[in-house]
């Protein structure tokens, strides 16, 4: 058994002293490989045992690629703006930067003791002004080009946190962090127009190697639908538009539903006879989250606008108008047409409110439930109760009805998206300051480049008051008066997702103070070749980074549209009781530093890679750590202490060695680390059975194993007689000819019972196999005093002897 603490400390010092993993980004002589981990938020609790799983995966691949002759970039940094540091500042009155820097040091120490091959000279932190200088610069370009803008809109407001939250930060009507109530309220918000990028984001999904489930989540989140926007008149004056993908059902409209919090309802209020009821319902609606309002199993609540009716433009029929919380003011037109015979939600709403139903597509009874488009499209179903369009197929009617409405001048074909504006402001302190000044004349002024970065000011009070941002407390800082321009700075800060939307670019050239990164370097190193991180970021960070990268591509700053060529999601490592580790459940957290101290970092890395497929969630087991350490000791004894290593090859391990090199190489490429380890275990078992182990074979196994267990890999490499690091040694190769089986195992049966087996050369004739079978001592004993009646040879498998 080796001393893991001594060995690991020794090699970590060696790597640091020799800058072993420092990447010369200007070396274009080798093919490049850019491996990236989703960088962590440096929380106060430090790393837990779940963190190293994904980090080890990229580490293994990047180490292999380095040995294969690639110039590897494998950086690490910190997503260091965020709410926990802000809450610390509010509670203690201390600037969150000190708290954050302390946490970064803790995280860095933990990562370094795990032996990852990160180039620490390229470390970044999103809260570093040298970094957020360029976050502000990119935002400035987005603002100047009209993609970032101020919009009056309903938002998720958390009074307890004193800030606006994005949809992905709200779970079941409560804030993701802290579980505080979230309500909807109208506010002027700084937003980024995501929908402007929708088509290219959808197209780009076809060009990247990502999990299909993640791509589908993004498609659904974007929510592209093609349909018709139709204008409806209101009896007594006024009009509104609806968007529908089912224009063929327009003759089946029996009511309309408006968003309770939309402007139209307020405009109609003087004509509404049941105003008190309507106002109460509106008040009830704004207390609900968007998710609660749009959940499919809900949507039956609402109120009829007494005194208000709409006119169906195709037949002049007057229909009732309702408000319902499932209609959102900021989605589509904020109004929907309701066809209860052909939409299940409308059907249930009609039942609840005693509204008529009109069937307009034949083919199914609609007395119990709606006959919906997924059931009638492409089935040859025809229209009924639809005037001149009766008898047409659904597909024919779509075209004909659309043409009629367009010719009437009240409709247009259009594309709609579920995609909303990305709210790009938070009423928090610990985030990037927005480089905008609000002038007295109501216009906005964007800071010139020479005034970037706009640095966060120190505050005496880090808590916002009365719904205002904490930066409102910076009375001197917020007053702007330079070069004849006077105004008040924007006091909201950018969301936590701002820095992570482009950080992968900064790693390439992290100390450039003239531009976010050198264009030549960006062209060479992008896109990221392998990106590993959790699936929970599918419609957040992974969407935002694609938007920013597409925008920077349009600007000619990056040379590729998509930032991440291949994406892999690691599964969660759960506590021994199956509970997720993390800051929400601290008592279930396994501290990797404790494992490193007891077993060694190599053991932790090996165990986590051997637990099962990378993408699956797996429960932690201390017994698994014991087993992993015992196997590492077994390998060490074989190669260093057994005395079996020789410069002469007897050929007995040729096949298993070449099979191992082939399988481990392929498995590392596909991130199938558990099966790669299994194959190395097979080799080690065979090597223990052998009299000697050919030294180049031992060295090849050590090279491959060193990607998973780098410290003991380096140590064994040195003890095998090498002076330089293993990190840049050439990757092992295999001989295809030696992968083929050159012998077969043949079983011998006498009267149907197995009596022995033997090894024979591949291609042996039946006569040769029969001869070898007869020479077995156990077979000869069974045949004593008997006459052989028949010998049946199943070539390559069995020699069956019948005797009596």
Predicted regions and their residues:
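Conserved phosphate/anionic-ligand binding catalytic regions in large, soluble enzymes, centered on
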Residues: 240-262, 422, 428-430, 434, ...
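Glycine- and acidic
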Residues: 38-47, 119-124, 328-336, 383-387, ...
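Conserved oxyanion/phosphate-binding beta-strand-loop segments in alpha/beta enzyme cores
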Residues: 1-36, 66-75, 98-106, 210, ...
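NTP-handling and nucleic-acid-processing catalytic cores
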Residues: 2-12, 135-362, 465-468, 472-483, ...
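Alpha-helical recognition segments enriched in aromatics with Gly/Pro capping
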Residues: 308-314, 318-331, 360, 473-616
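Helix-rich, typically C-terminal accessory recognition domains appended to large enzymatic cores
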Residues: 144-156, 332, 413-442, 594-759, ...
